[in-house]
Amino acid sequence: MHVLVHEEYATREPGRLRIARYARPVVPGADVAPEVLAAYAAAAATLAALGHEVVEIDPPFGAETVSEFTVMWYAFACMHPVADDQVELLRPLTRRLREHGFATSAPAFLQAQAALQLATRAALAVTNAYDAVLTPTVTQPPRPVGWFEDVDDVEETFERMKRFAAFPAIYNVTGQPAVNLPLHWTEDGLPIGVMLAGRLGGEGTLISLSAQVESARGGFWGDRRPPVW
């Protein structure tokens, strides 16, 4: 039996797929910029024009997953040992995450882990009915270098990151494959992506679908290159 490799999936038609979509973030305070919503709507229209069934769904994850994921984030920041005389070399946010992580009890960590496992199972029960799920990749157009840390409080840096990455972060928990498609551009020439997430082990379908969308849109980047390239 011949097993397709990723390069072969890129030249294989995906067939007619059933694709869910949603654009409502569950992270408190996260708002999706109009330009990002325009990219999302255009991507949905492209998928429909290619013959796929596009279905609107509610977010499969609830707002409670944010706090649970945050506890895990704190703990994982402590995984690698850092010598006492090197702690000050860490970025301020990394130091703060480690402080929270070391202050997190084992029961709190295990409770968050168990809650995320239950949330993942519940979400997969919904999304497994579809071949892929379409969302914005992030909530805002590209931010300037230093924007996340251009605040007085390091906790606000973390909040900005959570609001910005409201859609992709959860896939670090579920293990689902996901791909960013740079299909849209701001008036200033900055790329805006949309994200397709697949079933567990469904990388091949995502690659085939992404290649089909790229072909239909005449390529992702075309001749758009920074002058330094």
Task: Please identify what each model-predicted range represents.
Residues 143-164:
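Short, surface-exposed loop/helix-turn segments at secondary-structure junctions
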Residues 28-29, 141-142:
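Short glycine-rich, flexible loops that bind phosphorylated cofactors or substrates
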Residues 11-23, 72-124, 136-140, 180-183, ...:
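Short helix-loop capping/hinge segments that flank enzyme active sites or metal/cofactor-binding pockets
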Residues 124, 158-181:
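Small-aliphatic-rich amphipathic alpha-helix that forms the alpha element of a beta-alpha
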Residues 1-23, 41-50, 110, 121, ...:
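Structural helix-boundary/capping segments
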Residues 1-3, 29-62:
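Acidic-enriched catalytic cores of C-N bond-cleaving enzymes acting on peptides and small amides
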Residues 131-133:
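Short, Asp-centered acidic motifs that coordinate Mg2+ and/or phosphate
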